[in-house]
Every structure is written in structure tokens, then in C-alpha cells.
A protein has these predicted regions:
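Flexible, glycine-rich terminal cap/loop adjacent to redox cofactors
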Residues: 16, 20-24, 28-39, 47-48, ...
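Beta1-alpha1 glycine-rich phosphate/pyrophosphate-binding loop at the start
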Residues: 15-86, 178-203
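Short hydrophobic core segments
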Residues: 116-126, 250-259, 323, 401
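Rossmann-like dinucleotide-binding cores of NAD(P)H-dependent redox enzymes
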Residues: 72-73, 163-165, 171-230, 315-318, ...
Length: 465
């Protein structure tokens, strides 16, 4: 009997993954998806002119810590193309059609609109600056800071100016205050609240402002409880600023640091659920309310572990982890993003400001009975060189003793104390359990009794159990 050779032709289906956005979460998702599915068709669309960059590093580029902005770039479009990830710059997603598994894209260079199909869609379209309603806010030389181009333009302006105005005293405003002072500019920072850095408890915010004012040396002025009502200028740019109390002063340029808002419009229009924070609602697998559609990064709300509540906290560190989780699950895997603790840190001149978990005010709003202790201690043994103070606030629940949050401010090593507390919050430790920690000690690094243990020892006396 003759041998019969059956030739079987197998059609290999290749998954088509479409990613919208490409700064942190989107770029991370693309890289992870490619590693997991070497044969998948992956397309990344962004309205930006760059992808995969550290926007958090922009204030330090403006400050002059490094001259080449390209150091902020992590992976170039060309590098992605070598891995067969197709990057479409200046192409904006304008509509998601989930019933057809399509996205309407507009090429911003040609204005051509076209449809792309997907098997899995990952939304990572980030956030955008909030532009306050101020008269003449659209004058030239009034900036926001979000993208690479913003940083380049602000730095170029700073190098030919003598005075800068910052509107907003949050993280970006405070970081730019340092940047402009280091560039030898006179700076005016205007904040509508009674203190800068209002994500901290009021007592710590006041401490931050007091310490900043103490090192001003007439290089900068912080105006609190003030609003900007009008900018004046001409076609060449802004020339002066007017406040609600009638103060008027000249300036060369302005940076608006008045917060951000998540980009959710196309998701909402597609029927994707938003969360209580107004950002896109996702589960621990980064799945949205629509099948085969995932979301990650600054456009999504997150699970705040310590209180089992929701928060919108746009940070690059979280975005990268979320992008990884979204990609794993979109590729058929099983990964969960545990949530966030609300950990953050920044610096202004010689002052470090760091926090994790809940503030005392937020804890009370969520139904806890918070108690706290604040201590000011050396960050290392007093006879060592470069010793500095840190003020540490530790917060726990009165009834259970559970640690809820911590804040640290000072010229000393505040950030490493907060990192230790973040680990404790993740583990659900009580203040008594944390006090049992065997923290490192040597004179160049910490006092015999670390400020963390000193604060927790005092706080143990304030809790019920």
C-alpha cells in the first residue's frame, strides 16, 4: 500500500493587541506583551511626539542637572520597531467601538481618520493639566508641564529670564521652585490654600512652608491664600500677574501647576465605567467593565490598600506596574495589581518631603479614630558630620493600633523612614508590631534609637491596644 502523506496546513492565529498611549504604562504594556507573545501583532498609538519617557524627571532637566533631554527617554520608537512593536506617533484615538472591537484613530499630521481592529485593547492615555479659568490665561509664555516639549520650552524660557511665576504649590510647583532658584531666577509661587503641599496634614504643610521661607534668602516668595485673577501682556507674552487681593507684579513667564485630571472621555463614551474618583474603573487584573478592554496608568483609579478605598494617584512607579499587569492578562496570563499605599517623595532645595498611607484628616473621614505623634530628631548620631533634623509624624487607629500613615519632612534622610513605614502598612502592622523591628544602626546612618522607633514607642501609649 502506498504511503499517503497528508499535508496539513495550520492557520496560526496571531493576537492583535492595540495600546492607546505610550509614556509609562503604555510603553511598559507593549514591552511586556512582546516578551509574552513573540508573534502577536502589537500597535501603539499616541498623540505625543515621544514615547516611554520619564516625565517625573522634567523639573530636574529644567534645573540643569543634565543638559540632554534625551536622557529622559527610556525606549525609542525605533527600538520598539526592532522588536516588531509598531509605534504610531501623533496619532490620537478619538473613539472606541467595543461592539466591533475597533478604535477610530486620527493622524494629527494629515487629519486622516481610520479604523483599527483589536483582539485586546489596553487604554493608557494618561492625564492632562488642569487649566484654571484666569483672564488671559492663553497668553504666550504661560506654560504647563506634562510632556517633553513642555520641559524644553520652559527651560529655554528660564535661561533667558530673570523672574518666574509658579501658580500652585503642590509637587510640581515645589520642584519647579527649586529648579528656577538653581537657575538663578527670582521666583514667586502663588497657592490658593493657606499652605503649600496640601496633600500632607495641615501641621506638616505649615512646617514645610516655614522651613522653605527660612531658606528663601530673598530668592523666592511664597504667597498663600491667594488666587490669580488676571494675566496681562501682549503678543510677545505675559508681562504681569494680578491676584485676588489686588497685588500686581511683573514676570517673564508663568507655569501653571494647578493639578491634573485623568483622560477618560473616549472610555466613558464607549460605555466603560468610571470609578468614584472620576478615573477609569478597573479590577485587580486591570480589566475595565467591557470585555477584552484593559486600562492602566494615570487614567485609572487605584485600590488604596491601607483603607480598602479608592484613590487617583498619578505616579510613574504605579503606572509601570499597572502596565505590566494589564499586558500579562491581555496576553492570557493571570496577574493581579495589589494596589497602592499613597507613597510619595519630593525635594525642594535642602528640604525632603515624603509620606505614605493616610493623613490624619483622611483617616478620620474614612471612619477611623486616628491618633498621632510628631517627633523631631536627628537623622544620624549628633557627633557625625552632615547630621540633619527630620520631623516625623506617625498615625495609627486608636481602637486597633493599626498603623495608618506617616509623613516626614526635613533636611535629613526622610525618605528612607517612609519606605520602612510603607512596608509596615503593606503588612497591616500595628504600631506595637512595628516597634519590634530590628532597624539598622551605625553612627553615620542613624541614631541609636531611630526616629521611627522613637515615634512608635510614644504612639504605643496613645492607642487602646
Amino acid at each position: 500500500m502506498a504511503n499517503v502523506i497528508n499535508q496539513v496546513f495550520i492557520y496560526i492565529w496571531c493576537m492583535k493587541i492595540v495600546i492607546l498611549g505610550g509614556v509609562a504604562a503604555g510603553a511598559k504594556a507593549a514591552a511586556k506583551a512582546r516578551r509574552l507573545l513573540p508573534d502577536a501583532e502589537i500597535d501603539l498609538y499616541t498623540d505625543d511626539t515621544h514615547i516611554s519617557y520619564s516625565s517625573c524627571g522634567l523639573p530636574y532637566y529644567i534645573e540643569g542637572n543634565f543638559e540632554d533631554y534625551r536622557l529622559l527617554l527610556v525606549v525609542s520608537p525605533e527600538e520598539f520597531e526592532k522588536k516588531n512593536v509598531h509605534v504610531h506617533l501623533k496619532n490620537r484615538a478619538v473613539k472606541i467601538i467595543p461592539e466591533a472591537k475597533q478604535v477610530l484613530i486620527q493622524d494629527l499630521s494629515t487629519q486622516r481618520a481610520y479604523l483599527v481592529d483589536y483582539d485586546k485593547l489596553i487604554i493608557a492615555i494618561g492625564a492632562r493639566p488642569i487649566i484654571p479659568k484666569i483672564k488671559n490665561v492663553n497668553l504666550p509664555n504661560i506654560f504647563t508641564l506634562r510632556k517633553i516639549e513642555d520641559g524644553i520650552a520652559i527651560k529655554e524660557m528660564a535661561l533667558k529670564s530673570t523672574h518666574a511665576t509658579i501658580v500652585g504649590g503642590g509637587y510640581i510647583g515645589i520642584e519647579l521652585l527649586e529648579a528656577f532658584v538653581k537657575q538663578n531666577l527670582k521666583v514667586t509661587l502663588i497657592e490658593y490654600s493657606s499652605c503649600v503641599m496640601t496633600t500632607f496634614d495641615e501641621d506638616m504643610s505649615k512646617l514645610i512652608q516655614e522651613q522653605l521661607n527660612s531658606i528663601s534668602n530673598n530668592r523666592f516668595k511664597i504667597m498663600t491664600s491667594e488666587i490669580v485673577t488676571e494675566f496681562s501682556g501682549d503678543i510677545d507674552g505675559v508681562k504681569s500677574v494680578k491676584t485676588g487681593t489686588g497685588k500686581v507684579f511683573d514676570t517673564d513667564f508663568v507655569v501653571l501647576c494647578t493639578g491634573a485630571t485623568p483622560n477618560v472621555e473616549i472610555a466613558k463614551d464607549a460605555g466603560i465605567d468610571l470609578g468614584v474618583t472620576g478615573a477609569i474603573k478597573v479590577n485587580e487584573k486591570m480589566e475595565t467593565s467591557i470585555k477584552d478592554v484593559y486600562a492602566c496608568g494615570d487614567c485609572v483609579e487605584e485600590h488604596l490598600v491601607v483603607s480598602n478605598s479608592k484613590i487617583w494617584l498619578p505616579l510613574g512607579s504605579n503606572a509601570n506596574k499597572e502596565g505590566r499587569t494589564a499586558a500579562i492578562n491581555a496576553c492570557g496570563g493571570d496577574d493581579k495589581f495589589f494596589g497602592v499605599l499613597g507613597s510619595s517623595v519630593t525635594r525642594c532645595l535642602n528640604l525632603t518631603m515624603s509620606m505614605t498611607g493616610l493623613t490624619e484628616k483622611r483617616a478620620a473621614m474614612l471612619g477611623y479614630t486616628p491618633v498621632s505623634v510628631t517627633v523631631t530628631k536627628n537623622d544620624k548620631v549628633g557627633y557625625m558630620p552632615n547630621v540633619n533634623n527630620i520631623t516625623l509624624k506617625l498615625i495609627a487607629d486608636y481602637n486597633t493600633g493599626k498603623l495608618l500613615g506617616a509623613q516626614a519632612v526635613g533636611a535629613g534622610d526622610a525618605d528612607k523612614r517612609i519606605n520602612a513605614l510603607a512596608a509596615a502598612l503593606l503588612g497591616g502592622m500595628t504600631v506595637g508590631e512595628f516597634y519590634k523591628n530590628d532597624l539598622t544602626y551605625a553612627p553615620p546612618f542613624s541614631p541609636t534609637i531611630d526616629p521611627l522607633l522613637n515615634a512608635s514607642q510614644i504612639l504605643m501609649n496613645k492607642v487602646k491596644t
